[in-house]
């Protein structure tokens, strides 16, 4: 349900005719990190669907928390990526903007 709410908000507030940036805030259990550790960087990057691109991924290995910054033409691509880890990770997807876009929005 949460995923569909985020998708609806994204479509309302983001210009989905061009690529947008999304922050995935995640918390993974130890099983996820066991799987993650067996993968190559190429395999990890290959998990992002065509039309989406990982900009950055950071981990707090002490808590299992982390973030992924993804650029995507379509928000459903980001949801599909996060869903691939949903058995071992909880995640929240939030559309984000850079300073320039934030200023455009805030000064309207």
Predicted regions and their residues:
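Positively charged n-region of N-terminal signal peptides that target proteins for export
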Residues: 1-4
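Conserved catalytic core of nucleotide polymerization and phosphodiester-bond processing enzymes
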Residues: 10
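N-terminal signal peptide c-region/cleavage motif recognized by signal peptidases
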Residues: 14-16
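Conserved, structured core segments of small domains
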Residues: 19-108
